[in-house]
């Protein structure tokens, strides 16, 4: 969409204006579960991490249109979350890739807990020589540059973990949603109701029978 294209351009322009090649990485390191709003809350209520990732794979476009997650087993003991649509015919969106990888890493850390650690992160971008160590430090794992894809790899054992349900995070998510609605109050309140119903109907937690 044009809005997505505009946002991605802004992200790249901000990095250039600040002369900060790690803009997306640093921005991503400041994100948390609350960043993905209702999707994060729904992920934390799933029975396993696999189910939570399936939620992300299915609904992430509601939060970040144009981003698609592909979840797949990689070998016998590894899992891959691949980020697609981070580029178009004209350019690579380097900062968006940094932000997406970092955000998923942060969300997984919150869902899994202290045991979380990615095995490797792959980025299609070229390495930024003086900042290479920062990538490994922020992501907490080996980072491979000039890769064929933007992806994060981790032990498939994590897929069976039960997501940590943090009531404080859920309270924050709800409060943030309410505050956003207060600040950005739309003239047509039905838009909010329609949006919420679409989200609930999509997840299956709401049906015409129980509304």
Model-derived regions, located:
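Generic solvent-exposed, charged/amphipathic alpha-helical segments
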Residues: 12-15, 53, 57, 101-105, ...
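Short hinge/gating elements
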Residues: 37-43, 86-90, 160, 179
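DNA-contacting interfaces and partner/effector-binding or oligomerization modules
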Residues: 68-159
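Extended mid-to-C-terminal alpha-helical interaction segments
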Residues: 133-211
């Amino acid at each position: 969409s044009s809005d997505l294209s505009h946002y991605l351009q802004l992200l790249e322009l901000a990095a250039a204006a600040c002369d900060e090649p790690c803009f997306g990485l640093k921005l991503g390191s400041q994100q948390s579960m609350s960043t993905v709003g209702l999707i994060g809350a729904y992920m934390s209520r799933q029975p396993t991490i696999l189910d939570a990732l399936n939620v992300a794979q299915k609904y992430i476009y509601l939060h970040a249109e144009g981003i698609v997650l592909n979840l797949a087993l990689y070998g016998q003991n590894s899992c891959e979350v691949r980020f697609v649509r981070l580029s178009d015919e004209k350019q690579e969106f380097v900062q968006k890739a940094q932000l997406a990888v970092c955000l998923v890493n942060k969300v997984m850390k919150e869902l899994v807990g202290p045991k979380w650690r990615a095995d490797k992160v792959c980025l299609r971008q070229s390495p930024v020589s003086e900042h290479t160590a920062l990538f490994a430090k922020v992501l907490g794992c080996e980072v491979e540059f000039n890769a064929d894809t933007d992806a994060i790899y981790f032990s498939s054992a994590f897929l069976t973990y039960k997501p940590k349900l943090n009531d404080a995070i859920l309270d924050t998510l709800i409060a943030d949603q309410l505050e956003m609605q207060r600040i950005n109050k739309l003239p047509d309140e039905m838009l909010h109701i329609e949006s919420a119903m679409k989200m609930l109907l999509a997840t299956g937690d709401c049906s015409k029978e129980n509304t």
